């Protein structure tokens, strides 16, 4: 067993040197496992374990059916701020992109979303889902919920604008983050597919409650981030 472990460690060191030499740049795709094994003289099963160890150290990441990639620089995320993902990414010299996958109404209102109907009752909520990417690699998926009785027509106004911009321009509300919840989770299969991952991949869940000037919760965001893609920074 010790010999097997030593063999895996040796393979991991070879791969580590490959990464440090910059043969594949951040965000770039590694050769296939067969090609890597031939290039580095590593057996297939040993190579797979070494790759998994490097993934656990956030040095590489997988995309389902697309192979292994070198981890990009982590995105510095301050979730307590109202700055949009686009603006924060550009300020860090990154190339952001994003998109919506659904904009609809839902009558399924679990206890987590109860603050949205505490002041203004409603039997439905707007549900908006989407993703964000850096340099073409998707790094997070989000679900956003809003009470249509508080902000009628919000999903029609959204288009490609930020949520905070729509609140200010169309509803004259300035929103601030009032509550944050962080959880390490295994990503559900229906969500991981949007990020090119597989069911059960490790992720960081961020639940964000946004309030208006009166302190009423008007928006709840639930975000799933690839664990190797983000550093969370809270400014006190």
Swiss-Prot record:
<dbReference type="InterPro" id="IPR036390">
    <property type="entry name" value="WH_DNA-bd_sf"/>
</dbReference>
<dbReference type="Pfam" id="PF00392">
    <property type="entry name" value="GntR"/>
</dbReference>
<dbReference type="InterPro" id="IPR036388">
    <property type="entry name" value="WH-like_DNA-bd_sf"/>
</dbReference>
<keyword id="KW-0805">Transcription regulation</keyword>
<dbReference type="InterPro" id="IPR050679">
    <property type="entry name" value="Bact_HTH_transcr_reg"/>
</dbReference>
<keyword id="KW-0238">DNA-binding</keyword>
<feature type="DNA-binding region" description="H-T-H motif">
    <location>
        <begin position="33"/>
        <end position="52"/>
    </location>
</feature>
<keyword id="KW-0804">Transcription</keyword>
<dbReference type="GO" id="GO:0003700">
    <property type="term" value="F:DNA-binding transcription factor activity"/>
</dbReference>
<dbReference type="Pfam" id="PF07702">
    <property type="entry name" value="UTRA"/>
</dbReference>
<dbReference type="GO" id="GO:0045892">
    <property type="term" value="P:negative regulation of DNA-templated transcription"/>
</dbReference>
<dbReference type="GO" id="GO:0003677">
    <property type="term" value="F:DNA binding"/>
</dbReference>
<feature type="domain" description="HTH gntR-type">
    <location>
        <begin position="5"/>
        <end position="73"/>
    </location>
</feature>
<protein>
    <recommendedName>
        <fullName>Uncharacterized HTH-type transcriptional regulator YihL</fullName>
    </recommendedName>
</protein>
<dbReference type="InterPro" id="IPR000524">
    <property type="entry name" value="Tscrpt_reg_HTH_GntR"/>
</dbReference>
<dbReference type="InterPro" id="IPR011663">
    <property type="entry name" value="UTRA"/>
</dbReference>
<dbReference type="InterPro" id="IPR028978">
    <property type="entry name" value="Chorismate_lyase_/UTRA_dom_sf"/>
</dbReference>
């Amino acid at each position: 067993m010790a010999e097997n472990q030593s063999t895996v460690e040796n393979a991991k060191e070879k791969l580590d040197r490959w990464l440090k030499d910059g043969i594949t740049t951040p965000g770039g795709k590694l050769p296939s496992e067969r090609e890597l094994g031939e290039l580095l003289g590593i057996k297939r099963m040993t190579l797979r374990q070494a790759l998994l160890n490097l993934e656990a150290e956030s040095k590489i990441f997988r995309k389902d059916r697309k192979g292994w990639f070198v981890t990009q620089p982590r995105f510095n995320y301050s979730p307590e701020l109202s700055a949009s993902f686009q603006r924060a990414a550009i300020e860090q010299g990154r190339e952001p992109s994003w998109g919506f996958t659904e904009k609809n109404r839902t009558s399924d209102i679990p206890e987590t979303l109860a603050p949205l109907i505490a002041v203004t009752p409603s039997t439905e909520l707007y549900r908006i889902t989407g993703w964000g990417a850096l340099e073409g690699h998707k790094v997070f998926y989000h679900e956003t919920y809003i009470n249509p009785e508080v902000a009628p027509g919000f999903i029609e106004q959204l288009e490609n604008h930020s949520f905070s911009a729509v609140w200010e321009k169309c509803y004259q509300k300035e929103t601030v983050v009032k509550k944050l919840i962080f959880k390490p989770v295994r990503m559900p299969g229906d969500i991981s597919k949007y990020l090119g991952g597989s069911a059960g991949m490790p992720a960081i869940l961020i639940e964000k409650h946004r309030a208006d000037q009166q302190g009423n919760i008007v928006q709840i965001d639930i975000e799933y981030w690839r664990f190797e893609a983000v550093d969370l920074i809270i400014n006190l």
